[in-house]
Amino acid sequence: MTGKSVLREAREVQLAVTLIGLGARLQFLEQEVGLSRERRVRLYKEIKGVSPPKGLLPFSADWYMTWLANIHASMFYNIYRFRAQHADSELDALVDAYKMYLSHVEVQGGEAVLDFTRAYTLVRYFSSKILETTACVRCKGNFVTHAYE
């Protein structure tokens, strides 16, 4: 009898709980977690207390170019690049970097501009070479820019 490992399923549920807690949408969970849609929806409702949001994921790289979004996106992506060098997987790097981003914003007394979905989309845009970072000539910080500009 072949069945799903109880330990593997427990890890999948824990991963889903972590991702939902960070604000991941069902479309993201579908790609990263091997649970059925029904279980993902039930988990989401149990954790958030509401039905999951419907609609499309963000699709415009231009959103990251406004000054406040750019500062937050640049901060997150620089954290992500560092974490990606030391993480076991891209997903671990994404989760760790997003937690560090939220922690940094909280310590500074600010509000997070980048939600988890936008952070994930940002990483995808870099992987697709739609966005890149460019160093500022004054401060030498790396900021998110459109590729090929």
Residue ranges: model-predicted function:
Residues 1-18, 22, 26-27, 31-149:
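Long, charge-rich, low-complexity intrinsically disordered regions
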